[in-house]
């Protein structure tokens, strides 16, 4: 086809050049590419100009391949002299590599020899000869070469015909191309070299199926640069007319663009060498050369190959450029199928406007690609419009074509073939645009192109657990992300956008930044890869880039442009192993935040369920909660947070008797903690945090959780959370409290109620053990209520507010309220709750610190002692908090986040130093065991916590804060420290507590890094009283507790 197209496009100069080339090629037919001596035209055919020496046996294979490539064979085999540039095509990578092996000067010498011989032979040989040898190796010949280069493997057609040989030359494309190019221009030697090297070596010789597809670009740069090609071209008769044809070339570019489609489309008789070189046939000679090789495109009869110097030269300059462009297009398509059309178009179309710039090649490629694709669209199965995109990517990306890339390119081309034909009928720039679209947003990128829209469909395919249900939920929003994520920049970001949860599936900080659509967690703690697999693969792929690393993307493709289709196909066709859901994982790095979140939640839930099965006490309070607690974005997916309701069922199921469990949503507990609805909101997180109780261990991508929940791994925390998950509700609260260190303040109150309920239930569970404790706690609660009631406790402080609120509740409830508070304490059984009580005590130092406080502390301490053997309140706190760290930290808060937080804040510093990770871990175990028998009685837990606090309290409020904060705060660290929790929510202890909240807990949990400062801050803000007062209360409690201990 191209042969015919070429005759149309080819100018007389080109035909002459082609003849000379053919003559030269005949002369150097023996070693076309390296062949210093032209081979007989058949020999050339066999050896292929460039490809022959490198390919050696390529000619025969080419003969075998031509059938498919014949259509594009026109330009596949030879080194096309397009716009005076020799574009070498290689039938095989081997030929290309051989040629590449030649050093530039060697290659140049070869080319020069060829050029010398070519001019002689070209002049000597009639166009037919050249057509037979290389089809007149004119512009068309290079096109053929290019095409053969692209088709190298395919275009073995018509070895007998020289033209075919150009096609056949595919393997020895370089030969024909180089001959043509070198003949056409001495510049072409370097260019040919470059072209052969880039195009053949990396160029689009094999572009279609070889791997070097995208190489056109490589050659293109050099090809485009040389106007010198014309020198050799001038050497040829047509070379002299070269300058004129540049305009002609432009005209022809368009002309041939049109012609290309037709002529290229019509296969020309392979044997039909350019008969006479009629002047009108300058394009025809182009095609004509190809005609000998049957073209897929146009059965244009090979027109006489006029030696249109114009076309020849334009092609030399532009043509070579276009040749590369063409090669790129062909190579990109790796189809070489449209090689003939691209050759004609490439030569001429490329000639005109883009002759000068290598990038023009891309444009030319687009033009030529269009023609080429239109001609070979069927061949590539890409719509005619589609061709331009491949062409563009080919030219732009073709450059890098590496052998390794060839495989990828081939795959990509295949993918493209599929996708192009189906997907992008009319986007010549589609690839770039698509690529961008693919890159575009999705994961701020996620995967270069894995982002294309199909990416989200994979949503959570890779995600382990229950992702299937949720993944689809967010894909639409993330669609935009997925594509962008595809971009190298972004792909990795999600590289995926929301790498957060799925990657951290196990401990991903569901609690921290719920990905929601855009969980902050994603960026903050987690690699932005929602899907670790995709993110990693895509990142590696993406970062390697379409340019090189991208396994799926042809190296030669521009990163963002034109890769889209390529990438899309690549990803789809070549889904990287890591992206088994690759096509899913078109946005590998970025799953939709929601999908990730849901997947994570599902996974977590499953894990929790498993743990619950293993350890009923774990009672995955957050099992469902996690699902919902995990919903990352507070406001993003309020509904997701409602699943906390599911969590509630979990809670109820977990702590069947723990109203707080259900309360999660409706009750005054985490769900209530924050508005039940709000829980879904930012505070949905708290609910989430309920899930985060277990997430707290996962907070920060499981960072905080594991570290924070020394007692339990991510799941251990859940376990501890459920176990000492005081009541499940407490666990929910734990999650809430520690999960949303900033959120806990509000929920704590509802939690108080819920906690009380739960604590009542739990107390019933524990009442035998805790009867005394309850009584004592009642006293404590009364004292606390009084303290709370006392105005001393600043209402401004969230804790104060909590206490006041609790007071109101207690006051309203009277003894029952006290009992509720008592249960709360029991529930909290954590310094947090006691601290809350202490806060009221602080508020009313006399009353609080009075015997009642002591009694409370002491009694609770006794309970703690009984309940929690571990000495050092920190252990109980760690028990709750250590477990709470995973999730129990919240339980301490669960009863009353503020009180718990307060205590933890104060105790956190002391506790941090005192408890240490080991201490926290140990007590959680024991409290967990103790609790198990007690059914996680909130009171028992509270007692344990208080016991834990007792030692901490002796250190004073700071000790208590340290103790509790390390366990509560540190445990809550996943989210925030209790202080941070309260500060954020209550702003009670601002920076110190807040700072303590998130970062300090890590340290605090490990040691007493922040105890000194935060405790004071907490003490003052929490108590709303002076640190001394707060400490007074806690110390008063602490000493008795210590005594009890």
UniProtKB/Swiss-Prot annotation:
Compositional bias ranges of the Polar residues kind: 183-197
Modified residues (Phosphothreonine): 989, 1010
Record's compositionally biased regions (Basic and acidic residues): 13-28, 99-123, 817-837, 923-949, 1029-1045
Ranges in coiled-coil conformation: none
Biased composition (Pro residues): 270-280, 741-750, 998-1015
Claim: Ubl conjugation is one of the keywords in the record: yes
Disulfide bonds: none
Sorted UniProt keywords: Isopeptide bond, Phosphoprotein, Ubl conjugation
Family matches, as Pfam families: Auts2
Positions with biased composition (Basic residues): 1-12, 443-457
UniProt cross-references to InterPro entries, sorted A to Z: AUTS2
Site of covalent link Glycyl lysine isopeptide (Lys-Gly) (interchain with G-Cter in SUMO2): 858
Single annotated GO MF: RNA binding
Modified residues (Phosphoserine): 340, 790, 937, 977
Keyword hit for Phosphoprotein: yes
Biased amino acid composition, Low complexity: 48-63, 910-922
Domain of life assignment: Eukaryota
Protein family according to the UniProt entry: Belongs to the AUTS2 family.
Protein name in the entry: Fibrosin-1-like protein
Phylogenetic placement of the source organism: Eukaryota, Metazoa, Chordata, Craniata, Vertebrata
